[in-house]
């Protein structure tokens, strides 16, 4: 045992060690040290500010440079900068070649054709179903239904099951403010027409993530369905659906959970068997093929076998291969869900393209995908911070505004009154159950403001996809996108079919949306930031001249 002065020195060293980090700074304050007491464990973290240029291993950049070579779109459009992959992704050569090959050599309709060409087309069509099951690692008895996209899929799911589930006025359907209109309007239409059921909205926390604890406390025995997106198509937040599903099912196992995976499927590898083992598997999962590098007009629905055995689903359309017997006044239908919901002639080459796309995805290193997309995401913030700062001298009333920590909001509020009303409590709740913290509140200034809505929650283990919405109260989002188009840059403006998110969470009418994918490059990110900064400056000057 140590005694005397030596023991005292060691004791003082460990007592004051955490506080010593508080005074460590380099000359330009580029590092922020987050320090916690050493008594709580070695939890000292180093975080780079937005002034610090992000880094990634060069071999990962080279890896995705090689992946990009598989996309002929970029060879044919060398001067075009494409940042609209949340709307649709480009197609690798193997997908384009397969669709062309079908029309050249294999063109035939499926099912009921006895001749060899039709038989082969049917087999190849059904193989895609097996490819999807293998890719998402689901069971053989689980259902995969082909659709023409997520909008159709969400409508099909609502209409085929709502009469079975929503039978009383007090029955509840939970949605979120982040939902695409196709996951809101079908539920609204049924409720307004039939006068049964009611819609409630899940509470969001300060960062745009679902407040799970509050959600569970709001639910009850009358809650029948929760239908939410895995990733927002506007702010890019990836919800922790496994945690959400597990907690809901533990308390209310009867609730049907529907996940819209339109934005997430191209960025996240799903493992249904693992989710089932952890009791965190959705009952239904819906996605679009064209958003994971397959053809336009394609998609699929996953329906858990446990759900399909419990309910009798209705077809949305009648005719074609869903009929087993037709009499003068009554008809009988098939029981197979895939046959029941795939009425009429399908987009056969498009469905085949989904299989080829997933075979292409199997070769992608998914450990690299998230790292690379977040590197590009951070690189954009870095360059925007750099180039917009250059404009501060010329245009002092233009602010680059983040949802950022370590800001003295109390003094800021005295000179920049916010649009939002705060109460005296630590958190506030508006009329729409959206909670936000004072310390991370986005500031809507009375002065000219340019905002990038980004709240970096990765240090808390909450993930994002590479989507960044921009907004200015000085100029229109549509003007920004139009002028960027003159510079061969493709980004999207509007409410992106998510008007509730804009109205109740972002509190703006529309945004300009940048969506990043693994075929984008650091050079494109730099050019994008340069042009947004210069275009914003120009649009401000145009306004000031009026």
Swiss-Prot record:
Its EC number is 2.8.1.7. Disruption phenotype: Parasites require exogenously provided mevalonate for survival. Apicoplast structure is disrupted. Keywords: Apicoplast, Plastid, Pyridoxal phosphate, Signal, Transferase. Residues 1-22 form the signal peptide. Catalyzes sulfur activation and mobilization in sulfur mobilization (SUF) pathway for iron-sulfur (Fe-S) cluster biogenesis. Active when in complex with a partner protein SufE. Required for apicoplast maintenance. Plays a role in the development of sporozoites in oocysts in mosquitoes. May provide sulfur for MNMA-mediated tRNA modifications. InterPro entries: Aminotrans_V_dom, PyrdxlP-dep_Trfase, PyrdxlP-dep_Trfase_major, PyrdxlP-dep_Trfase_small. This is Cysteine desulfurase SufS. It catalyses: (sulfur carrier)-H + L-cysteine = (sulfur carrier)-SH + L-alanine. One of its GO terms (cellular component) is apicoplast. It comes from Plasmodium falciparum (isolate 3D7). Proteolytically cleaved. Its cofactor is pyridoxal 5'-phosphate. The active site is at 497 (cysteine persulfide intermediate). The modification N6-(pyridoxal phosphate)lysine is found at residue 291. Belongs to the class-V pyridoxal-phosphate-dependent aminotransferase family. Csd subfamily. Dose-dependent inhibition of catalytic activity by d-cycloserine (DCS) was observed in the presence of SufE. Compounds related to DCS may therefore show antimalarial activity. It is found in: Plastid, Apicoplast. It comes from the Eukaryota.
């Amino acid at each position: 045992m140590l005694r005397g002065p030596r023991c005292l020195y060691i004791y003082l060293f460990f007592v004051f060690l955490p506080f010593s980090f508080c005074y460590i700074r380099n000359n330009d304050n580029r590092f922020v040290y987050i320090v916690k007491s050493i008594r709580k464990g070695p939890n000292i973290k180093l975080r780079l500010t937005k002034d610090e240029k992000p880094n990634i291993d060069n071999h990962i950049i080279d890896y995705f440079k090689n992946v990009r070579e598989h996309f002929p779109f970029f060879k044919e459009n060398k001067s075009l900068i494409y940042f609209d992959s949340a709307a649709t992704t480009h197609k690798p050569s193997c997908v384009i070649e397969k669709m062309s090959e079908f029309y050249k050599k294999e063109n035939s309709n499926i099912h009921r054709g006895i001749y060899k060409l039709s038989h082969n087309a049917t087999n190849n069509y059904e193989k895609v179903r097996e490819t999807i099951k293998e890719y998402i690692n689901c069971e053989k008895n689980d259902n995969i239904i082909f659709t023409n996209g997520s909008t159709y899929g969400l409508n099909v799911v609502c209409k085929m099951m709502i009469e079975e589930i929503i039978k009383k006025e007090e029955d509840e359907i939970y949605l979120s403010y982040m939902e695409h209109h196709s996951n809101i309007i079908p539920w609204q239409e049924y409720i307004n027409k039939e006068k049964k059921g009611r819609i409630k909205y899940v509470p969001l926390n300060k960062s745009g993530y679902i407040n799970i604890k509050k959600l569970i406390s709001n639910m009850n025995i009358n809650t029948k369905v929760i239908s939410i997106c895995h990733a927002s198509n506007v702010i890019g937040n990836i919800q922790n659906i496994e945690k959400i599903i597990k907690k809901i099912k533990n308390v209310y196992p009867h609730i049907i959970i529907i996940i819209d995976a339109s934005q997430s499927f191209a960025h996240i590898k799903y493992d249904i068997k693992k989710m089932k083992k952890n009791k965190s598997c959705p009952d239904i999962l819906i996605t679009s093929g064209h958003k994971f590098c397959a053809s336009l007009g394609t998609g699929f629905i996953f329906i858990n076998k446990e759900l399909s055995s419990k309910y009798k689903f209705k077809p949305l359309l009648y005719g074609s291969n869903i009929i087993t017997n037709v009499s003068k006044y009554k008809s009988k239908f098939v029981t197979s869900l895939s046959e029941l919901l795939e009425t009429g002639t399908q987009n056969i080459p498009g469905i085949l393209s989904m299989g080829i796309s997933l075979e292409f995805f199997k070769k992608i290193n998914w450990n690299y995908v998230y790292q690379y997309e977040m590197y590009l995401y951070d690189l954009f913030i870095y360059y925007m911070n750099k180039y917009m700062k250059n404009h501060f001298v010329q245009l002092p009333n233009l602010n680059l505004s983040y949802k950022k920590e370590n800001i003295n909001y109390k003094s800021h509020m005295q000179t920049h009154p916010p649009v939002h009303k705060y109460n005296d409590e630590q958190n506030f709740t508006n009329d729409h159950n959206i909670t936000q913290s004072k310390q991370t509140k986005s500031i809507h200034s009375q002065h000219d403001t340019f905002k990038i809505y980004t709240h970096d929650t990765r240090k808390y283990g909450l993930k994002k996809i590479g989507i960044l919405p921009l907004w200015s109260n000085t100029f229109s989002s549509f003007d920004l996108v139009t002028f960027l188009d003159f510079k061969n840059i493709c980004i999207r403006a509007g409410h992106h079919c998510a008007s509730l998110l804009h109205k109740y969470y972002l509190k703006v009418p529309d945004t300009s949306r940048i969506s990043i994918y693994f075929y984008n490059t650091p050079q494109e990110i730099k050019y994008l930031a340069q042009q947004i900064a210069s275009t914003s400056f120009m649009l401000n000057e145009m306004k000031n001249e009026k």
